[in-house]
């Protein structure tokens, strides 16, 4: 893999398309999307359900491969990387936040955040320090010992954000992170994601139909039926 650099874009997509199926049953989920994402940017990918938001995030994060076009992460063409390289990239360079919180119900907030580091073989002392810092970063330093059922929906999503941050990733992908939250809580989560981009120099890419969340991003990419419909 190429050497990482603090200069230049973190992600570049060129004429990326994704087609599922073939022949008469083929469905085009994305069509010729091009974009450049710089370090520390907060980008919102917006559109209605089925517009291609999740498909785009999957391509940009290396979870899926485009049918045509290229995606580069830190200068590396993802199509040329081995699966083991992609796994390593996602483990150390990328954090994921989803609509469903995905927390282990019998583990505390601290233990949930530590879990990826524990699986990766990090020492107890280092993973405890990192998890504590990540929980403090999302405003849950005093709730570290609480289990998910003792936390509100917004607090559970903050735990999932802390879990995404604990490996100190370069990019955080968030797929509909406010979809199960009320308006006030959703706004608070949006502010937290904005703070991540601003204070931790992580790039944040959010797929959302929540216009309030999108308004807090530095830039929007609007998708309509898999095509870039961004105005201006």
Regions found by a protein language model. Give the residues of each.
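ABC-family P-loop ATPase nucleotide-binding domain
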Residues: 1-19, 229-232
